[in-house]
């Protein structure tokens, strides 16, 4: 084969010979010399086309670039080729950044490295937020240090000059202004005012039987606040800084009798102590954990010579009539005198004024034993509810006392017909509390006709207290929307006694009277005669 191919190449190279034959063909076929001449010379391997880069002229932005170009003409001429390749990659970046900074950066780079390796850029937003967080932390630490210094100065230097007092007052005002500065929040975190109030109710605690001295005296108020924060040290620090944010007094009887606005009467301290020396209050804690633990830690404790009633607003304690006692024949007003004294008209030594609420706390705690652990610490009384008028705070003459233990009810019934002066000068009427069913038109129903549960009713109660009647009615209307409106989702209720009974309507036999027509009489006579047997016997 090699020899034949050599001969073939020799025959093709000779231009004079026209009739060339190939041995591997079947016959003697002639080859066209014009076609054969095309394959005489080879062009060789194909070379890749060389693309020449387009030279782009840089725009002049300012006089500083002109000065640098005049000084560094030689260096820029050597690096023009490198800059052309880098301009294609960094064209977008060069439009944003200044040309002066780019030229200085190029001069420092080595001319051999055409493509530089870029380091991963840091996230500017993360670094900015980190810096802001550090600054806020430093500011908070400074404020805490300043507060601690101020407290030490106030405690140590009470007998100071008036000039120094003025300077301290100025510092206090400036520090209070700094404390009032709040960190801005996003609108998704701020929320609506209604949702804020509901969230605030989870951190709110109700106080009953609070001494009215806390309104009149600043020292008494400080004592009360210190007592309310006494258990916060036992809470874990990880849940947040626990403290008492605010306290507001409610159900206060004013001496003006409604002629003066309540705020003005409160500012003047015109409080009517003749009706009752106690009042109610609401305390707001900074965390939900503190508000949850406050009832268990503070209920039944003594502060300002009165037993404190503590209960949660969001999750109030259950009223159990089996552990309750009804107490009647109480004084309407606390300064009421003994009726037997007016009849006898005898001069006696003046005794202390009556105090219905505190007297019930002390009397039933002293005369009930219950469990030894409970009696040794705080007593067996869980709560005392004296029914009073809203505006005048005059009592209705009866109250309810609830115990922790059901055994204490039997011991409390033994106090019927007894009196305990001076706080309870009248004879008490003690009976068991009865559970009276509330008469309602019907249960609240949703859009699908299902009865709403206890959770919805408790929410309605809180809405009525926080937002008033109009706000509660608005929330009630929103709650009746369909589930697609993101209102209330019903997931079922727990089984209770008697709920498993299925009510089926059955036909009552004998409810309708028997017919008294002719056919009924004939049937009765037929049955009386013994039926078919009686007929055949005849």
Curated annotation (Swiss-Prot):
Gene Ontology CC terms, in alphabetical order: nucleolus
Domain RRM residues, every copy: 203-315, 323-435
Key word RNA-binding present: yes
SUPFAM superfamilies attached to this UniProt entry: RNA-binding domain, RBD
Coiled coil residues, start to end: 64-156
Biased composition annotated in UniProt, kind: Acidic residues: 63-92
UniProt biased composition (Basic and acidic residues): 127-144, 151-173, 182-202
Stretch list, region Disordered: 1-25, 41-203, 336-378, 433-455, 476-538
Swiss-Prot/TrEMBL GO biological process terms: maturation of LSU-rRNA from tricistronic rRNA transcript (SSU-rRNA, 5.8S rRNA, LSU-rRNA)
GO terms of molecular function: RNA binding
Compositional bias segments (type: Basic residues): 502-521
Keywords, alphabetical: Coiled coil, Nucleus, Repeat, Ribosome biogenesis, RNA-binding, rRNA processing
Keyword Cytoplasm: no
Pfam assignment, any one: RRM_1
Similarity section: Belongs to the RRM RBM34 family.
Annotated protein name in UniProt: Nucleolar protein 12
Gene: nop12
């Amino acid at each position: 084969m090699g020899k034949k191919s050599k001969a073939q190449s020799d025959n093709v190279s000779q231009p004079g010979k026209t009739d060339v034959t190939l041995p591997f063909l079947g016959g003697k076929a002639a080859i066209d010399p014009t076609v054969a001449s095309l394959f005489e010379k080879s062009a060789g391997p194909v070379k890749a086309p060389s693309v020449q880069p387009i030279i782009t002229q840089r725009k002049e932005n300012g006089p500083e670039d002109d000065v640098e170009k005049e000084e560094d003409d030689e260096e820029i001429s050597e690096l023009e080729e490198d800059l052309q390749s880098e301009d294609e990659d960094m064209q977008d970046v060069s439009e944003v950044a200044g040309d002066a900074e780019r030229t200085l950066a190029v001069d420092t780079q080595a001319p051999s490295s055409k493509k530089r390796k870029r380091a991963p850029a840091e996230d500017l937003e993360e670094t900015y937020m980190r810096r802001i967080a550090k600054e806020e932390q430093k500011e908070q630490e400074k404020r805490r240090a300043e507060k601690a210094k101020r407290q030490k100065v106030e405690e140590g230097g009470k007998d100071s000059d008036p000039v120094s007092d003025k300077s301290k007052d100025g510092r206090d005002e400036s520090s209070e202004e700094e404390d009032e500065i709040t960190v801005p929040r996003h609108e998704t975190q701020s929320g609506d005012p209604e949702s804020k109030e509901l969230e605030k109710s989870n951190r709110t605690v109700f106080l009953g039987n609070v001494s009215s001295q806390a309104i009149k005296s600043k020292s008494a108020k400080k004592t009360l606040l210190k007592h309310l924060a006494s258990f916060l040290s036992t809470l874990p620090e990880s849940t947040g800084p626990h403290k008492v944010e605010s306290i507001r007094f409610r159900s206060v009887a004013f001496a003006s009798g409604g002629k003066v606005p309540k705020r003005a009467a409160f500012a003047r301290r015109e409080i009517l102590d003749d009706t009752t020396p106690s009042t109610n209050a609401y305390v707001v804690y900074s965390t939900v954990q503190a508000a949850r633990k406050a009832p268990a830690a503070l209920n039944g404790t003594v502060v300002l010579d009165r037993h404190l009633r503590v209960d949660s607003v969001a999750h109030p304690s259950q009223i159990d009539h089996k552990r309750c006692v009804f107490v009647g024949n109480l004084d309407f007003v606390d300064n009421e005198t003994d009726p037997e004294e007016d009849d006898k008209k005898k001069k006696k030594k003046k005794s202390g004024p009556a105090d219905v609420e505190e007297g019930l706390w002390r009397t039933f705690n002293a005369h009930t034993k219950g469990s030894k652990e409970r009696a040794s610490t705080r007593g067996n009384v869980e709560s005392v509810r004296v029914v009073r008028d809203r505006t005048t705070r005059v009592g209705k003459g009866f109250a309810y006392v609830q115990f922790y233990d059901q055994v204490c009810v039997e011991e409390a019934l033994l106090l019927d017909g007894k009196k305990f002066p001076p706080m309870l000068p009248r004879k008490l009427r003690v009976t068991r509390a009865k559970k009276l069913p509330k008469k309602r038109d019907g249960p609240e129903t949703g859009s699908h006709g299902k009865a709403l549960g206890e959770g919805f009713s408790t929410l309605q109660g809180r809405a009525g207290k926080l937002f008033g009647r109009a706000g509660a009615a608005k929330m009630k209307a929103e709650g009746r929307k369909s589930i697609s409106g993101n209102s209330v989702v019903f997931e079922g209720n727990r089984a209770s006694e008697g709920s498993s009974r299925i009510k089926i309507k059955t036909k009552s036999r004998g409810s309708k009277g028997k017919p008294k027509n002719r056919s009924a009489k004939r049937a009765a006579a037929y049955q009386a005669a013994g039926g078919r047997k009686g007929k055949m016997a005849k």
